[in-house]
Amino acid sequence: MITVPAHRVKPFGVEFFQASFSAKDIDRLVKFEVLGYSGAEEPPTKVKQRANRARVNWEALEKRIGESETAYQRPVIRRKIDELVSYYRDCKDAGTLPAIPGAVIITSEKRFTFTPMASQHDLGLLQIPEEHGVLRVLDGQHRLLALHALTQAGENMGIEVPAVLFDRLDAR
């Protein structure tokens, strides 16, 4: 299990958690998956690889992305990831802006365990099964894929990723 400090929120009876993860934890725990293409829809054509400023290793990155008809995400937009890789590097160099200011939204089919602090019922420690792919991205795939690309390139960005986590959410 991985344990992170968390804030438990339960509006309208739907429980979720707010937490922060290291880039390393995100890379270990998140499964990237895009919607599969079946029936009348055609898969997106592969864009011819060209040199770019971000220098993303697309072959390695695309091996990390699964395809499923039950996935939450649309296909990956390469340009967006290239731009985010450059943005993360600029943020690191400038040291003035958070690289990921908005929370990503993550779901899991596995249950989390929340242990509240003695004095606060909504603040505590969240335990998440430590398995590759236990978390799936509902919103924020491009931000996390750009971070993954940098990690694979050997760049330690030292980024903390704010996240909203659901362990019982059916997004459909």
Regions found by a protein language model. Give the residues of each.
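N-terminal extension/subdomain marker
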Residues: 1-100, 106-115, 124
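Basic- and aromatic-enriched surface patches that contact anionic nucleotides/nucleic acids
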Residues: 99-102, 106, 110-172
